[in-house]
Amino acid sequence: MTMSKTVKLAQHLEQLHINNMYKNDFYWTWDKTDEELEAIFTVADALRDLRERNRSTRIFDSGLGISIFRDNSTRTRFSFASACNLLGLTVQDLDEKKSQIAHGETVRETANMVSFMADVIGIRDDMFIGEG
């Protein structure tokens, strides 16, 4: 029996020095090492391979992905929702008008508070247009 592409990709991941990626925020690609970026693309390849072979990519039985999108977005919003679904998470969009942000709470404070309930938080804020 031949080894599946996913198994080979998992073995490749074990060879990379990516220990500081677990439970760590991902803000900018320029903060990542070459091996960390390689790991990200390797995981994407493994997920694609699983999906193409009609294998489950869900690593969560249930859970919550919260999106805080401060700027209008189509591709990023749908990409985040698709990724959450692929992993088994339900997406909840944070509506700033219905949150404490409308009353002066910072996005950082809000994200910190909801992080206790979420498995992942996606934030889209064009603070640095054209960077990252």
Which ranges hold each PLM region?
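Generic N-terminal leader/processing signal
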Residues: 1-3, 122
